[in-house]
A protein has these predicted regions:
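Hydrophobic helix-and-loop "lid/oligomerization" segment in the mid-to-C-terminal part
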Residues: 6-12, 16-25, 31-145, 166, ...
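Acidic-glycine-rich active-site phosphate/pyrophosphate-binding loop
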Residues: 80-81, 180-191, 355-356, 527-528
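Short alpha-helices
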Residues: 105, 183-223, 231-243
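Acidic, two-metal ion nucleic-acid-processing modules in DNA metabolism proteins
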Residues: 111, 116, 254-352, 386, ...
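Short beta-alpha junctions and helix-cap segments that line functional grooves
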Residues: 132-135, 151, 156-160, 173-175, ...
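Histidine/acidic-residue-rich, glycine-tolerant segments that coordinate divalent metal ions
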Residues: 150-204
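Short alpha-helical basic/polar micro-motif
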Residues: 208, 378, 382, 632
Length: 688
């Protein structure tokens, strides 16, 4: 993996930091949060002071006016008329997290405004993705005169024609990219990515578009004093979808995600509370974006992957905790089944790749198999991309039909690749880095050849090397509670706002790593050398400042900062002392405790427990031993465990310590001297 150290212009950092101190109240006595945040914001493309302030402190006032979205006003007019006439409406949504959350948002909003709304979420296997003619025909026969799609429909030309023929008005709300033929002929199309739409933010997920439609409807129908409370309630659900669908957490998405996660600490919906329970997330705090992505979203997705997503809508509609817990437990069990099926299919994929050398040489990997569960092929495609760093398509054959999912790397636009083969598909859709499709099984070989040719014309071998962006080099003594608190202002993390990654040179193992569950590593690391970028003679305080994290220039301030790191947690402690966990201390207390308990060279005595996820395989053939030095790339987190909690680091990558040219020369000289000495010993005395 290639590490790329990001840079920020010092003058820009200084200017933005001054603005943050002046207008946002961000500072710090022993640790300059403003400089830290300014540097990280600039490296994320946010250099304007007003944009930085909005990023750090999102509010409801930062939401764009919904009527700016093309088609939304016409959609609100038609829904408003249906409410007035007591017409039944049908909300037609996708079966993933984004689609089900969109259904919940719009259905609830319509009902709060006095309307009648039912929903349909297709069965993944029996019905597949997108609008279907037979569902529209059944709805029309039941008296439905308005169907609203959410998170789908932007390429549903034939179903739109069926709706028109049946006398049903169709409103398409979607966020997927329209095809080359434009958009379907519907009463209204609400999609910020359609041609002619001047909505200022294009990156909303499907539930985000549904949220904007709900916002516009409530502005039309409800008392203004009730709207903000309801918007925050809907944001809880929209935030889950926004994070799960991996859209950029910038602009309006950041407002939705940040405020929605904060509101989840006050969840009152029985379904939400039961879901947080089964995911083992404390109800007394806001969940993190990581917890949403890896604990909440998979359980919601499992319903649509393994069974029917209707259970998700029922969960969020439950009125009592007993029923909510029953449904949440069902989703939890479905997620366990999904994990087992995913492992089974992934083993088949690995066997196929290891047994076919041509696949490893392919610029685009296309794998197909009979009977692979269609609910997990997208996840397994992601796993193959993570392992081999190639665009990957996984296709499940079902007789004469085939259904596939694709996932991509940073340098390859997947939807463009798929569109170059559009004649091979019966239907398709997606984004730059994810897609889905259906096709005749007979076309798979042609697809494999054409996709690989398309990729070879656009990719270089260098594109297949994974790249890890590193925000700064950091010494263990600089990992402090104050740094962690500064980083928290950047949350929630996700696409477009990645969690800050740091690197450290020459971290030393105090013991051999422990292997956990045959996959992960637990390491005990102590600080290595001060990063090489620090010039000889610099003080520790200067070293910290050189990292770009604004530590005060006095030695006492540096000691206070580092003592705070040592005393904050039993996970970060001097070798020579066992320091009890305590509440926040004064600077004087920190100095006194550090003086009593720390070794004189305290910067080199700090020890961290570190977790390295899915890295056990990398040390099986070349074991790491106590005393070995490694270069690490890592993130900084916090464990809330009442006894063992505290600051912790998670490794994103590790490498055997790279020797500098000077170290190599020194070793060569030592080796040469040793060889000469040995030579003289073996040669015996000189003749007289």
């Amino acid at each position: 993996m290639k590490w790329v150290l990001k840079t920020a212009e010092p003058a820009q950092v200084k200017s933005l930091a001054q603005e943050l101190r002046s207008h946002s109240g961000i500072g710090g006595k022993t640790f300059d949060q403003a400089t830290t945040l300014a540097r990280l914001l600039i490296m994320r493309g946010i250099a304007d002071p007003e944009a930085a302030s909005r990023f750090l402190s999102p509010s409801l006032s930062h939401l764009h006016a919904p009527e700016k979205m093309l088609g939304l006003r016409a959609a609100v007019d038609r829904i408003d008329a249906a409410i007035e006439r007591k017409e039944p409406m049908l909300i037609y949504g996708d079966y993933d997290v984004d689609g089900t959350m969109a259904v919940i948002i719009l259905k609830t909003a319509i009902e709060l405004c006095g309307g009648l709304a039912d929903f349909h979420v297709p069965h993944r296997i029996r019905e597949g993705y997108d609008l279907r003619d037979d569902v529209i025909e059944r709805a029309a026969a039941a008296g439905v005169r308005l169907i609203i799609s959410v998170d789908m429909g932007i390429r549903a030309f034939a179903p739109a024609e069926t709706a028109r023929r049946m006398g049903v008005d169709l409103i398409v709300t979607d966020h997927h990219l329209p095809g080359p033929d434009g958009v379907p002929k519907a009463l209204a199309v609400v999609n910020p990515n359609q041609a002619g739409c001047e909505y200022p933010y294009k990156q909303l997920c499907g539930a985000g578009v549904a949220f904007k439609l709900a916002q516009g409807l409530m502005q039309r129908r409800l008392d203004p004093k009730d709207q903000n409370k309801l918007l925050l309630s809907f944001m809880k659900v929209a935030a889950i979808a926004t994070i799960a669908d991996a859209v950029p957490l910038t602009g309006e998405n950041r407002v939705i995600a940040k405020l929605g996660l904060d509101a989840l600490r006050h969840a009152v919906n029985p379904g939400l509370k039961a879901l947080l329970e089964v995911a083992q997330i404390s109800p007394n705090r806001a969940p993190t974006s990581t917890e949403v992505a890896f604990r909440i979203a998979p359980r919601i997705n499992a319903a649509g992957r393994m069974d029917v997503a209707r259970d998700v809508i029922e969960l969020f509609s439950a009125k009592d905790m007993a029923r909510a817990r029953e449904l949440a437990a069902k989703l939890d069990q479905l997620n366990t089944s999904r994990q087992e099926e995913e492992r089974r299919v992934l083993r088949s994929l690995e066997d196929r790749i290891s047994g076919d050398p041509t696949l490893c040489d392919a610029y685009c990997i296309v794998l197909d198999g009979e009977g692979w569960h269609r609910g997990v092929i997208g996840i397994t495609a992601t796993r193959v991309v993570e392992r081999y760093n190639r665009p990957t398509f996984v296709i499940s054959r079902d007789g004469e039909e085939a259904f596939g999912s694709g996932r991509s790397i940073r340098a390859f636009h997947l939807l463009e690749a798929v569109e170059s083969c559009r004649d091979l598909f019966s239907r398709y859709g997606g984004h730059a880095h994810a897609c889905g499709f259906a096709m005749p099984a007979a076309n798979i070989e042609a697809l494999r050849a054409r996709l690989d040719a398309f990729a070879r014309a656009r990719l270089r071998l260098a594109d297949f090397e994974p790249v890890l962006d590193v925000d700064a080099e950091l010494h263990f003594g600089e990992i402090t509670p104050e740094l962690f608190q500064a980083l928290r202002l950047l949350e929630p993390y996700g696409v477009g706002n990645p969690e800050p990654v740091f690197s450290a040179h020459g971290a030393k193992l105090t013991a051999p790593p422990r292997i956990l569950k045959d996959k992960h590593l637990k390491l005990k690391l102590t600080a290595g050398a001060i990063p090489a970028r620090v010039e000889a003679g610099d003080s520790p305080a200067s070293a910290a400042s050189a990292a770009g994290f604004g530590v005060s220039s006095t030695e006492d301030a540096t000691q206070e900062m580092s003592a705070a790191a040592i005393l904050a947690s039993p996970r970060c402690h001097p070798d020579s002392a066992s320091i009890p966990r305590r509440d926040v201390r004064t600077a004087a207390e920190n100095r006194n405790e550090a003086a009593k308990n720390s070794a004189p060279d305290w910067r080199r005595s700090i020890v961290f427990d570190a977790l390295a996820w899915n890295m056990a395989e990398r040390v099986q053939h070349s074991p790491l031993l106590a005393g070995d030095a490694i270069d690490i790339a890592f993130t900084i987190g916090h464990n809330d465990h009442p006894e063992y909690g505290g600051l912790e680091i998670s490794l994103r990558d590790l490498k055997r310590e790279a020797k500098t040219s000077e170290e190599t020369k020194t070793e060569a000289k030592v080796e040469t001297r040793s060889e000469r000495k040995a030579s003289s010993v073996h040669a015996g005395p000189h003749p007289a």
